[in-house]
Amino acid sequence: TIFNPQIYYDGAGGLYDSNFIRHLHVEFEDDNYHSILGESFFTEPSLRIPATVTFDGITLDSVGVRYKGNSTFCLPHEQGNVKVPYNLDMNRWISGQQLMGYNKLKLANAWLDPTYCKEYLASKIYRNYLPTPEVNLVGLHTQGNYTGLYVNTESINKQFLNKHLGENNGVLFKCDGAGVFCSQGGGQGTDGGFPSLEYLGADTATYYDSYTIKSDHGWEALVDLISTLKFNPEDLHEILNIDRVLWAMA
């Protein structure tokens, strides 16, 4: 079967419609939200606080919100800039709640991309060859104040796996060690190693500082991939879709 990922992407009027910029409003129950989320980023990264979210005439209550990112959080945060990236979980407290068919929103502040175009253009190119997160731009308002323009990127999670692969039991890792840009360190559960796919030994614990696991399991699979890459590259095709990886790198 010829791979045709286009059938999975939003059309006009969908959450990731890129024909125009819509605005998303987030109203936190606690006006002290920025201090709470800024502190918890380092001490309790999974902590979410409730907010009401309004987008394109749709209002959702009890949405779980936390800050996200590593470098794109640390750099503005340490400068006292409130334009940090957000992660919104629609069904954190209300089971099955979604926004236009999606249960998670990831709002990137494009801190390292003044053009706001890199992720959008990459998504448009990659989607022709492999499963790719959808991307568009939204204006974010928090507590009634305009926070700025954000890159709205589809979350690579179980819903994404179901959408493109028809199953959701795969292994997911975020290859970005926090602490590299954070003077405080420790954000998002890591201490700032580099995810270089370098073999560090058979003990999975030696990889904790460099990779953040996003699935229910997978450390052994990660070490197996890295070990095969170093010691048995001729067997790599058995555990890695080399063709799609090359398309992504190209």
Language-model-detected regions and their locations in the chain:
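Phosphate/dinucleotide-binding and metal-coordinating scaffold of catalytic cores
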Residues: T1-A250
